[in-house]
Amino acid sequence: VLVYNGSVCDAVWSASAGYNTQTGVYGTCASLDAWGTDVPYLQSVESPYEEQYHKLLRRVIGKDYTYIEYNDSRTGEPYQSADTTHKDLGGFVQYNTLVSNGRSYRYINQFVSSRYCFDFGTDAGGTPCMTYYGYGHGVGMSQCGAVGYAAEEGMNYKQILRHYYTGAQIRTRTTRSGGLFGWLAGLFR
């Protein structure tokens, strides 16, 4: 069981963090930016073994993408530019600004990863494209990073969990008398 200060951890994870888990703008805790909750064991850590998963290009065409339309709904004209410069220390986008005819639209991102960039007009038809780095919220353990740590550094599951969940401890259930209550009491020793 993974515990922090005697309490069982909410060991969240994502598929790929893209080189490091989310870096909090408001401090060192990644969970604060992702969900607005300060969880001390969910801090930003390196996750370097994600090279093959790091850059996932996904092209998004017009209204097929449910979270954003690339045309201004009031004028029907395409957005002229996108600004993703509002990022935290780890490169995760905090919010975006879309510009259409000089007007800006700021919205909270809801994409498959919060580390991405827009690239307008890169194909022959001028289809807007997005490049994602990582896949998921980027908080807690990265599955791709964990595989890399095991393969490249020979880390076992305990070392990997300690790396991704800062300050957490692994407690082993024992078969001593007292049943479940005895085991739970052991968590607080």
Model-predicted segments: where are they?
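Conserved, single-site charged/polar hotspot
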Residues: 1-189
